Each structure stands twice: as C-alpha cells, then as structure tokens.
Amino acid sequence: MSREVMEYDVVIVGGGPSGLSTAIKLKQLNPDINVCLLEKASEIGAHILSGNVFETRALDELFPNWKELNAPIKTKVNKEKFIFLGKSKFLSWPTWLLPKVQHNKNN
C-alpha cells in the first residue's frame, strides 16, 4: 500500500492565535522553512473572529502594516462594559474597578 508523504520542517497543531502567530513568526524569520499548520476548523482562524474586543498589539508586532493589508478589523470600540456570566444570572461590574489591562484603549 502506498501513501502520499509530505515533509515539513515544523508542524504546528492548532490554528488559533498562538499557533497562527508562531507559524507567521517562523516564516518571517526563515522564509525557506516548510511549516504545516493543522486546524480542526474548516479554515485557519475560523474560530478566532468571534465579535470580541481585539487588542491589536500582536498584529502591530507581526504585521506592522496590517491596516494597509485590509485586515477584517473595522469597528472601533465606543463603549465598554464588563459582565460576569453565571448559569442563570449575570453581574455588571463597574469598569473603574478593573485593572488597567482590562480597559480597552484606542481599539
């Protein structure tokens, strides 16, 4: 029985934020390296864009020109709210009680 074989220098399991940024950085450091990124979703990043608040610092570091590349990040945050979700109830938390790292700024 014969099987098709594909050889890679690096295989990354999971196309989430960590796996995707690892693959990107590896290719930036060495464009000749063969990288395989395995993802269970129908396409890479399918589970990433979820309507969440996205801190763009990682994009700035990986792709300094990401805004010119027409990245699908268009909506700026105009209001902030922090809510704890329980099984049957929720609790709104005043944003002034949150640490600075939890505040959205310039996104």
Question: Could you tell me what each predicted segment is?
Answer:
Residues V5-C36:
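N-terminal Rossmann-like FAD-binding beta1-loop-alpha1 element of flavoenzymes
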Residues K89-P94:
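Short acidic/His/Gly/Ser-rich catalytic and metal-binding motifs that mark active-site loops
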